[in-house]
Structures are given as structure tokens and as C-alpha cells.
């Protein structure tokens, strides 16, 4: 199981002398696209250069004070900002120590010493409207197969007003797991999620705007990570989730292990992204064209990031 974490402010922006910024950030930039799943969970997003960029957490307190209520984030424009720990619309962009990963991974691209690899899987991009209608029809008819796997998010309604937040009691805001059932259709896996009125008009990657109570089908797809082997860093290429409070308790002194969002990643996310089916295919056929396994995934990645298709390469 991966020990998922977030980058620090210094990793992303460097120190006061603008030194020590990670090479992976220097070369790939600070802006980050939010997945449709994250947007459906309340992720903020800004349309920049035709892409929906979201804000994402660092693990660094604003001032390093134990009574500090705020954490540094990277906003949708890729600049440093800070926000109180109870807000839920900032997204999670996990990272991990790449040197500790022992399982096989897929390299799909390498440029300027930065690799793009595939490892793990998670609900990410919305299915187009026509196919969504077919899935919804099968769902209502009860003929979609449940795989037995579920993905966990927070069911607590996002509070973005400080006065409302101050009037809540602990039970109103503590993490309350919400399970998203995974279904399979023709060998492809999906989850179903209904649009929230609170996030109405959110722009999705297929051009639709979110409508309240409308069902959306999200495809479970391989996770793309940016890797810098010398720095031993793997960083998710996209914002994977949102809607989870950074820390409920008063004060944050940079002890990231004690935050609500770290506990969420340890207890749920790190377990639910673990690899399954495709690793067996890689071991059996190391020369297979990547399109033969992930045709739809690569198509979507091309649309979102104009990624060039390459051959699979076993890295480990």
C-alpha cells in the first residue's frame, strides 16, 4: 500500500530565496487539471487555456504557527495562496516516494527527465452523454454487474461560509464515508454519481455543465503519475479527489500525519487505488500496444493533455 502524501510549499514554490523547488515542478509547472470526479465532488476550477484547472493542497501551514487555521494551496492559476483548513473545495493531488514502489508500472512518456507512468486506478473522467444514457438504462433495469469494489468519498455537505461553519457542531462536519459502487459493462468499470445542486453548472470535460440530481457515469481508469527518479517523487498528473476537509481540529502545526485528509488517504484512497487487472496483462505481454489495453483512456488523455501515444515499457 502506498504512503500517499502532499507536496510542501517549498517543494512547489521554493524557499524565500526561490531555491529548492522540485525539478518535477520546474519542468511541469504548478497548474493542474481537475478530473471530472473531483469536480463532481465540489472541486473549484478555472478555465485556463481551454482546460479546467483546479486548486490543490500543499501540506504546509501558512505561518507555521501551532494555532494557525490556514494552509498554503496552489490555486487554479498555479500561484500560491492560503485557505482555512475546513474548506472542502480544494483538491487532492497525491504524491509518494517512488523508490518504495516495487510493483510493475507502465511508462507512457518521457521528456526532460520527467516520466509519465500508469499505476493504480480510480474514477476520473465522465462518460459521454450517449453512452451514459445506455449505462443508466442498464442500471435501472438491474442488469449492470457489481464488481464488489467501492470507492469512498466524504458525504458531508461542503460549507463555504465562515459564519455557517462557526455555528456547526462537531457531528455536522466530521468525515462521513460515502460509498460509490463499482459496476462493470463489457469489461469496463464505472461508478455512478448524481450531480449536487450546490455544484450546478460545473463544467465537465466533455463540455456538459453539471445539473442537479442528474446521474453521471465516471469511468474507472489508470492513474497517471509524473515521476522524477532522481528526486524519488511520483506526483499525480491530475487532481484526483475533492470534498474532504484538510483538518477539523483547531490549529495546524505542520504535523500532516494528524490531519483528516491524510487519514482519508491512508484509510481509503491508498487502498482503493491499488492495481488489479492490467498488471497481469503487462506481465503476460510486455510488447502490447498501449491502445489495446487502454484505448478509451488514451483517447481521453489525448483530448485533455494532447499526449502522444507510445509503446508500453515495463519499468519495474
Segments from the language model and where they lie:
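Collagenous Gly-X-Y triple-helix signature in extracellular proteins
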Residues: 1-316
Amino acid at each position: 500500500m502506498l504512503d500517499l502524501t502532499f507536496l510542501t510549499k517549498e517543494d512547489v514554490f521554493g524557499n524565500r530565496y526561490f531555491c529548492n523547488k522540485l525539478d518535477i515542478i520546474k519542468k511541469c509547472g504548478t497548474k493542474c487539471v481537475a478530473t471530472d470526479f473531483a469536480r463532481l465532488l465540489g472541486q473549484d476550477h478555472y478555465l485556463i487555456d481551454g482546460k479546467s484547472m483546479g486548486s490543490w493542497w500543499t501540506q504546509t501551514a501558512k505561518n507555521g504557527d501551532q494555532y494557525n487555521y490556514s494552509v498554503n494551496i496552489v490555486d487554479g492559476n498555479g500561484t500560491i495562496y492560503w485557505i482555512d483548513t475546513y474548506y472542502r473545495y480544494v483538491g487532492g493531488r497525491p504524491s509518494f516516494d517512488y523508490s518504495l514502489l516495487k510493483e510493475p508500472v507502465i511508462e507512457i512518456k518521457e521528456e526532460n527527465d520527467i516520466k509519465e507512468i500508469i499505476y493504480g486506478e480510480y474514477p476520473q473522467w465522465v462518460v459521454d452523454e450517449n453512452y451514459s444514457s445506455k449505462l443508466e438504462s442498464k442500471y435501472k433495469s438491474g442488469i449492470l454487474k457489481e464488481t464488489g469494489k467501492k470507492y469512498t468519498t466524504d458525504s458531508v455537505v461542503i460549507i463555504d461560509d465562515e459564519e455557517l461553519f462557526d455555528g456547526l457542531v462537531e457531528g455536522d462536519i466530521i468525515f462521513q464515508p460515502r460509498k460509490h459502487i463499482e459496476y462493470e459493462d463489457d469489461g469496463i468499470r464505472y461508478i455512478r454519481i448524481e450531480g449536487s445542486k450546490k455544484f450546478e453548472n460545473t463544467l465537465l470535460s466533455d463540455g456538459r455543465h453539471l445539473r442537479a440530481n442528474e446521474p453521471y457515469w465516471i469511468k474507472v481508469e489508470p492513474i497517471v503519475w509524473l515521476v522524477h527518479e532522481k528526486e524519488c517523487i511520483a506526483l499525480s498528473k491530475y487532481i484526483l479527489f475533492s470534498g474532504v476537509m484538510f483538518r477539523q481540529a483547531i490549529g495546524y502545526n505542520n504535523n500532516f500525519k494528524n490531519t483528516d485528509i491524510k487519514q482519508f488517504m491512508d484509510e481509503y484512497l491508498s487502498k482503493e487505488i491499488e492495481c488489479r487487472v492490467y498488471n497481469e496483462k503487462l506481465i503476460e505481454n510486455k510488447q502490447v500496444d498501449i491502445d489495446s489495453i487502454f484505448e478509451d483512456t488514451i483517447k481521453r488523455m489525448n483530448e485533455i493533455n494532447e499526449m502522444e501515444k507510445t509503446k508500453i515499457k515495463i519499468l519495474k
